[in-house]
Design a protein with these regions (language model features):
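Short His-centered aromatic/hydrophobic patch
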Residues: 88-94, 112
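Acidic donor-binding loop of glycosyltransferase active sites
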Residues: 278-291, 303
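Conserved donor-binding/catalytic core segment of Leloir-type glycosyltransferases
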Residues: 4, 188-214, 220-223
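A short, well-ordered alpha-helix in the C-terminal region of glycosyltransferases
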Residues: 333, 340, 347-362, 368-374
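A conserved, positively charged/aromatic
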Residues: 109-138, 151
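Short hydrophobic beta-strand element within catalytic cores of glycosyltransferases
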Residues: 304-307, 317
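Nucleotide-activated donor-binding/catalytic signature segment of Leloir-type glycosyltransferases, i.e.
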Residues: 239, 249-268
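Conserved acidic donor-binding segment of nucleotide-sugar-dependent glycosyltransferases
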Residues: 319-320, 324-331, 340-346
Length: 383
């Protein structure tokens, strides 16, 4: 079985790499199209024995004159690789490939990493209108699958397929020698670390967004309220700007310092997040749109987790059972839930233990990638 995978970024999408690596190790040949064939994840794919093809297969909305040349290149590569199935992860790639291969009968699978584009009427309609009988969908959360079915897509062409990671291997890794952020930033042992781990995604003004997608400003507003009841808490924001959002990141830092003063710490990018998680008291995910997001990571590391009640979060953050859900864009409600966890440590620990067990089983790469392999086989068998 030969799969042609299309990934729009060479910088991230670790979930796509983990999945492809497992598939390669389990008798599925994976050829991956990336914007670059050197550096970044291209090197990781090749080190894992996978062929990488250089190509930007995104829909050139801002440079429409590039469309026909790009479509010609897509048809050339597909004719050369001769895949049994084309696997896509990003809507901009999906639109481009469907238009370029509209009459091509090669089966295509869109593994939808989140419901964000479905929340835009333009992309929601556009993505479905260019689909043909060759197209199939694998939603990476229950909400995504539900939206497609509600929009009239045949349920037989829609599957549930989470992205996963090597969680069993992670569980065997030695614990860090000791705290990292506490000594680095002079955080006392009595201070509770309430953390948000996320890149900064700038607001999309053209669709009316005034705050960033990940809800950084909501977290800051919530922590201002938390400090009134729990002055011993500290707000920690880990991450940096994503894809040209440097000006937005600076504005959030300024906003945070204005509202919280020295009680908020912005660490910037860290390559040791997995070693930092054990010292975090509560992980907060106030996203405005999301799949499973960072909640999967914080639960996997056994950190008490609060997330907004949107997207795929409820699949793993079962309110009151594995963590707490909070209304989206509601800093006051978020503050109440942070305070609840601080004031109920035993109950919080029990929820977190259940959440860790759920995530480590549900999102183990052998289970998630095994599901994708089964979907491939089903699509190809049905012809």
């Amino acid at each position: 079985m030969r799969i042609l995978q299309i990934v729009k970024t060479n910088r991230g999408a670790t979930w796509a790499f983990n999945q492809a690596k497992w598939l390669m190790e389990n008798n599925v040949e994976v050829v991956t199209v990336l914007p670059e064939d050197r550096g970044g994840y291209a090197d990781k794919y090749m080190a894992a024995g996978m062929q990488v093809v250089k190509g930007d297969w995104s829909l050139p909305l801002r440079r429409p004159w590039k469309f026909f040349g790009r479509a010609k290149e897509i048809r050339r590569v597909v004719a050369e690789i001769k895949p049994n199935l084309i696997h896509l992860h990003f809507v901009t790639n999906v639109l481009m490939v469907r238009l370029a291969l509209h009459s091509d009968k090669t089966p295509r699978l869109f593994q939808v990493p989140g419901p964000l584009h479905l929340e835009s009427p333009f992309f929601n309609f556009g993505e479905r209108i260019v689909a043909t009988d060759s197209d199939h969908w694998a939603g990476a959360c229950k909400k995504t699958c539900r939206i497609y079915e509600e929009k009239g897509i045949d349920p037989a062409r829609v599957s549930l397929a989470y992205y996963g990671g090597p969680l069993a291997q992670q569980a065997q890794e030695p614990a860090p020698a000791g705290p990292i952020l506490r000594p680095e930033y002079g955080i006392g042992q009595e201070e509770k670390m309430i953390a948000m781990v996320s890149y900064f995604y700038k607001p999309k003004r053209y669709i009316g967004q005034t705050r960033g997608l990940k809800g950084h400003e909501d977290f800051i507003d919530a922590m201002e309220l938390v400090f009134k009841k729990h002055p011993q808490a500290r707000a920690i924001i880990i991450g940096n700007a994503w894809d040209g959002a440097e000006a937005y990141e600076k504005s959030v830092i300024a906003y945070g310092k204005e509202k919280l003063g020295d009680r908020v710490i912005f660490t910037g990018y860290r390559n040791d997040v997995k070693d930092i998680y054990p010292e975090i008291d509560i992980a907060v995910h106030p996203s405005h749109s999301e799949n499973l997001g960072g909640a999967a990571e914080s639960l996997a590391y056994g950190v008490p987790t609060i997330a907004t009640n949107i997207g795929g979060f409820p699949d793993i953050v079962v309110d009151g059972q594995t963590g707490l859900l909070t209304p989206v864009k509601d800093p006051e409600a978020l503050a109440q839930r942070i305070c609840y966890m601080l004031e109920h440590p035993d109950e919080t620990r029990e929820m977190t233990d259940r959440g860790q067990a759920l995530v480590r089983q549900l999102l183990e790469i052998a289970n998630t990638a095994g599901t994708i392999k089964g979907i491939y086989e089903k699509i190809l068998k049905e012809g």
